[in-house]
Amino acid sequence: MYNDKRGEVIHLRYPCPITKKQGGPVLTFEKYVRPGTTRQAYELLQENRLATVIGGMMWLRLSDRTSPLGIDLSGCGLNKVEETEDAFRIGAMVTLGQLEHHERFQAATCGIFTEAVRDIVGTQFRNLASVGGSLYARMGFSDIVTALLALDTEVELEGAGTMPIIP
């Protein structure tokens, strides 16, 4: 089924497995879905606890494994930064580069995020790596979690509500 415009789940099957190139890691999905809402993604994950949630894929590319289901969040509308009266709502799929160059966010936070991502690899990487993936991965070389903690950030999780970031 492929019907993204109505918010339905997209099911795509790959007829042949991806093979390793020059001995590098390969992540393979037996089945791939692209839900249109976070609720659909959550329900799919509840049905299959061995599923892999796919965001920017920067950290997942480091693994060499097969997953029964890949749940791609790119159709869920999580790639926006929204400003409310007293806060910024940052979607999990917002890239580090988007946040780094968001002028109103940078002004409101005295440029803390620009400083936090400055030493992360390069511009190309920051334009692909997501805020949600960075929070989930908690890489030791990344100051992103520290910056978000300093800003008293809370996360909103589908099915669990709003909560503070726990270091």
List the model feature ranges, each with a label.
Residues 2-5, 9-167:
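C-terminal structural segment of proteins
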